[in-house]
């Protein structure tokens, strides 16, 4: 078993995962992750937080939020292929992992989007593969447990298109056939958002019956890798995310699940950073409740992609440098404001609700490195500070 001793002091209550409710109060050392984790997945059951997959491969770690001095403890390895971007949520005392993307076998020529589902049982510290397939590709989707024991899932890449594109790309030697390679990339990346056929249903999985259903259609463009915060029982805020590869949206939507259906409401967009810098939107941002507000921090985008899309150039990020953002926004239920900055640009990590702020865990930095650090964004409704 692997536990981490090195830790950071956080004079806060112990955090809950951003998409979970509740918090554990304590005054303890908060340990960094055992390894850097980006593009992974996380969930919480009671006082136990679980994080893994992504850049950690099949590794899976747990932290007792009532006793964080024990550090992150290695749990049973994930039994499926190493996967990025899986949708993960807890229900009925177990953790469910859906889809994601990666190579089906180590010698596979190209990655695919998986249509598999797995369950982790903390009691036996074991994984099992479920006898089901996801109805659509769910890589990049967000999953959240509902009060009735089911799991709702938002967004997700189209498996058929994604698999074919990566197989075609993998079959071309871009050094020997640069024109053919460029033509293929331009063709795929130059499509309008609707052409990618991302999942536009709010899917629901019922662990008790091992079956799938729908809570209705998303009336907006479906997106992947949005930031997500739980606002209350059955209420979820989805912020920004991709609407096609390389192009984000600044939109935010409130989803209320009532009487077996998802009801959508558009709320204020993320604000411009300045008069000269329009809001590009972000993918892979951190989000959670901080007091009465929602904080959204970091994420990644391509500066100039919105202008290209507005001009009809749908390969919107062509030639643009990827930017890992350090901006932090606060939402009071009506309006957004720029709250402050992260210590560095970060995206694709995990976020934990904590009394007084938002705990930022791992992620990817501007060099593409997976980070281990954990720090608290403290927010009192007026001023943002960083506590290491």
Swiss-Prot record:
Q: Which InterPro entries match?
A: Kelch-typ_b-propeller, NANM, NanM_proteobact
Catalyzed chemical reaction(s): N-acetyl-alpha-neuraminate = N-acetyl-beta-neuraminate
Its EC number is 5.1.3.24
Subunit structure, briefly?
Homodimer.
Q: Which HAMAP family match?
A: NanM (MF_01195)
Query: Under which main EC class is this enzyme filed?
Result: isomerase
Chief site of localization: periplasm
Q: Which family does it belong to?
A: Belongs to the NanM family.
The task this protein performs is described as: Converts alpha-N-acetylneuranimic acid (Neu5Ac) to the beta-anomer, accelerating the equilibrium between the alpha- and beta-anomers. Probably facilitates sialidase-negative bacteria to compete successfully for limited amounts of extracellular Neu5Ac, which is likely taken up in the beta-anomer. In addition, the rapid removal of sialic acid from solution might be advantageous to the bacterium to damp down host responses.
Location of this chain's protein in the cell: Periplasm
Q: What is this protein called?
A: N-acetylneuraminate epimerase
UniProt-listed Gene3D superfamilies: Kelch-type beta propeller
The gene for this chain is nanM
Segment forming the signal sequence? 1-26
Which Gene Ontology terms cover its molecular function?
Answer: racemase and epimerase activity, acting on carbohydrates and derivatives
